[in-house]
Amino acid sequence: MGFYSFPESHASTQSYPFIASTRGSFDLADGTNIQQENLPSALNILNNDNCPGELTIYVHGVWASEQEAEEQTERVFLSLLNTDYDIPVIGFSWDSNTAKNPTGWNLAKVIANQNGQNLANFILEFKNQCPNDDLRIIAHSLGSKVVLSAIQSLYEIGITNADNIVKSVHLLGAAVDDEQVSLDKLQECVNINDPPLPCSGEAIESVVSNFYNFYDSEDNMLAFEEVLFDATPWNWFDDNFLSVTYPSPYLMTETDNPLGAYGKQSEINTPENYQDYNVTAYIGNEPDSDKVNGCDLEVNLRNYGWLIDYYYCTITKTGDNHFGYMGYRSETNPQTIEDTGAIELVAEQWRNEIN
């Protein structure tokens, strides 16, 4: 995972106001819980005494700073707005900014798992205040583990679909094991999660009305990546390119495929309310989704045996950009959206539920 280069900041200059943050609750060095975070209610965050009727919670993924979490949440809101789906979006911001290496990745998984209870408490408080409102959740990358942990927490206290707690969940490029959504009680689910987290199928079936998994077989953080690079960069007059396939950062550290790259494992049983969708075609080949620091995902080929430092933008084709699910800001006006990414399909599926 240390082979990929991430810009220092993927953040817009304008901060997004609607954030529920548990940052500072966990030690980024060892993942231990150092303080209990008492989150304000959703209505307090929205600065509104009236229930909104419908609310979305967005949960960001691994290695997002506080500012990046705000930027992504705002981008989800703007992308929804572009589809004429105008509802408030609250970002759930958690301690994901561990070291950008395999050790940091493992710590981030632990922190994500432990944040599930915090998210579950936040959800329950909102539904206690606004029992008739539809609550929707969108999670990106490792944020999917936060959400699955939250759903498990709700399931374990007896929440069912009859309680009308979670209307829908959308996972975008989920950085979790492709067996995690199984109805079967597989020991592997328990073994790969710290603290232990059972397979999520029963919790999904019981707690969530509609559950969607958006996967992308070209996602550069999750799937195998074919890199085309100039074999003779010193010669401007030839077109001598080499094709090399590298494992993704996820596949370099995990022993199984991610749910967000190829969908659920074919052998497992999943609940009827679980659906896989291949959204590769919705993720454009634009390398800079937030319009801040250029390419969203670079790799230094020297780390793979190249003789010199050679930074290569891995986003060259449809589906490559792991940060494109939430949409793409406009080059001329970054406060607007030029492409809604996979959020277009999210809004379409919400409308289909209503109709």
Residues covered by each model-derived region:
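Alpha/beta-hydrolase fold active-site loops
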Residues: 53-54
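Lipolytic serine-hydrolase domain surface
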Residues: 6-49, 62-66, 70-133, 152-355
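Bacterial N-terminal signal peptides
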Residues: 1-2
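Gly/Ala-rich beta-loop-alpha elbow adjacent to hydrolase catalytic centers
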Residues: 119, 138-139, 143, 147
